[in-house]
Structure formats: C-alpha cells, structure tokens
Amino acid sequence: MKYAVFALVLFGFSVQFYFLGGAVYTDMLSVMFPVLFFYLYLNSKEQSEKRKIITYILMGLTITIGSLNKFTVIIIAIAVGIDLLINRKFKEFAKILVSVVSIMMIFNVTFNLYMYSSHLDRQTAKGENTPYNHWVMMGLKGDGVYNPEDYEFTRKYDYDENRNSKINKEIFDRIKNLGFCGIFDLAMTKSTADFGNGTYGAEDFYNCNPQTDTKLHDWILPEGKNYKKYATYATSMHIAILIFMLTAAWGFVCSDDEKRKKMFSLYLTIFGVYLFLLCWETNRRYFSNFAPVIFICGTLGIDKFIEVCLKTKEKIKCGLK
C-alpha cells in the first residue's frame, strides 16, 4: 500500500505529465502497454493453467498493439523473456514466446493483407518506407539528433538501388571515423540528452504555431519567460525518481528479497531502453513511454533510500563526536 501511495505522490508532483496528455503522439499513445504487459505477467504467476492461457493471449495482444504504436514496447517482452531464462523457467518462457509471436504474426499478416489489398501499393510503400537503420545512422552524427541531411541521404537512393546497403556502409564509416573515444563521448552526450530532461519534450508539440497564447505557454514553451523554472522543476523531479530507481537497483543487488526478484525484469527493461537509445537517434521523448516503469522502479527504492540516509546520518553524528 505504501508503495502505491508513494507512486501517486511522485506522479502528482511530476507536472510534465499534465502536459504530455495533450501530446497525441506515439510516445504517449503507447505509454500504457509496457506496464500492462508486466502487470499481466505478474498475474500469470499466481493463476491456474487455464487462466494462464487467457493471460498469455492478452500479453500477446498487449505487445502487438503497443509495438504498432511504438516498436520499443517490445523491449519489456524481451526483458521478461531473459528473466525467465535466467531463472530456468523454460516452459513458461516457451508458452509466452509462442503466444506473443503467434499473435504478432497473425495480426501483422492480416493487417498487411488488408492494407495492401485496399489502400496501399506494395512497391510504392517500399519506396516511401524509411528503414530502421536510418535512425541508427542519424544517431552517429554530431550529437545524434535529427538532421535533414541524413534524411536527404536516405531519400537519395531508391528502394531498388539497395538503400539499406548504402545506409549500412555509412553507419560503419561513421563508427570507424569516431573511433573508441568518439563513440564513448557520443554515448555520454546521448545519455544526457535522452535521460537528462524532465520535460520529456512536451513542448515539441505545443510550439507548433498555437492558435491562441495562454499563460501556460509562458511556462511550457522554450521562449516563455517562466520556461526555465518549469524545466528546472520537472528535471529535478525526474532526476529524483532516477535516484530512487538506482537506489532500488542497488538494494536488489545487495538483497535476496523475493519481492525484489519479481521486479528484476523491470530494471532489465530500463537497461534495455538505455542501450537501445545509445544506438538510436537522440531525442528526449523516446523513453517517455517507459516513464511509468521508471516510476515503479523508483517507488521500490524508497525503503533503501531511507535506510541509506539514516546510515549516513549516523556516520556523520559519529564523525562529529
């Protein structure tokens, strides 16, 4: 109960979410799916075999619909799979894998048949499609942020001209030119940009020629007179939650608590998101659909955080005597 209350308190003070609700984009549209998948996974652990079948199907639907909005949702399914393999729960792993993969395949085949038979020409779609490695390539130039030059580079080649091979060659050339030190510096820059801004980029949507100016624009738009106050507060809350999360992770390493072990896949998910974003285009919005996962991980760190604070206080007292 105390964890639930603490999570609500953290959420209540995280004002950036009040504005993100109006930003109708894939990041926010997919925000419920990672935590819903994990919720179903936890429920399956205490269910009968018959009930588990229904839950596994729901897990497959959750990942399928979520990944259609934002394909990064699939990271939590991978994390759960790794957790099951580490704990040698091979049967459960196989059942979840079959459920998720089967539903994704059925849905994608059905969706593609419908779209290509009624709305899209397959060859035109191939030509207009932007391959995933485009964003990997973009993440290796400058600070890794969006740049129109890379978009023009990708569009310069037709699908039939082996666009993917041209992009892959450019990726390897950029890695080679950066070298180890350059890659490390870029990783630090991208880490700060991706995880170091508590506004979660909501202003990117509200800065598109608003029809009317309101007092809120003074706070949430970068050119507003109060934006720095808002950004500083939002980022402070964000960093506080990250500190709680890291404290909980440390407590997990130092403890054999079974309750904490159940949450291992959540910490693995955040690590997976971090690794993914190091390879992707730099954008502070791209982890926001996993913000609820970070909240849960941070909430679990409150006990360990208080314990560390009390121990530090005692050490300071002893040092002053």
Please tell me what each predicted stretch does:
Residues S117-K215:
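Membrane-proximal stem/loop segments at transmembrane-domain junctions that anchor or position
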Residues I54-K70, V80-G81, S99, I103-M104, ...:
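Membrane-interface alpha helices of multi-pass inner-membrane proteins
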Residues F19-S30:
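Short acidic/glycine- and proline-prone juxtamembrane loop motifs at membrane-interface regions
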Residues I76-V109:
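Perimembrane helix-loop-helix junctions
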Residues A4-V15, Y39, I63, S67:
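Short helix- or helix-capping micro-motifs
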Residues V35-T55:
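Membrane-interface transmembrane helices that cradle and orient dolichyl/undecaprenyl
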Residues M1-F13, V31-M32, R260-F264:
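Transmembrane-helix signature of polytopic, membrane-embedded enzymes
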Residues T189-V273:
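Membrane-interface anchor segments at the N-terminal boundary of transmembrane helices
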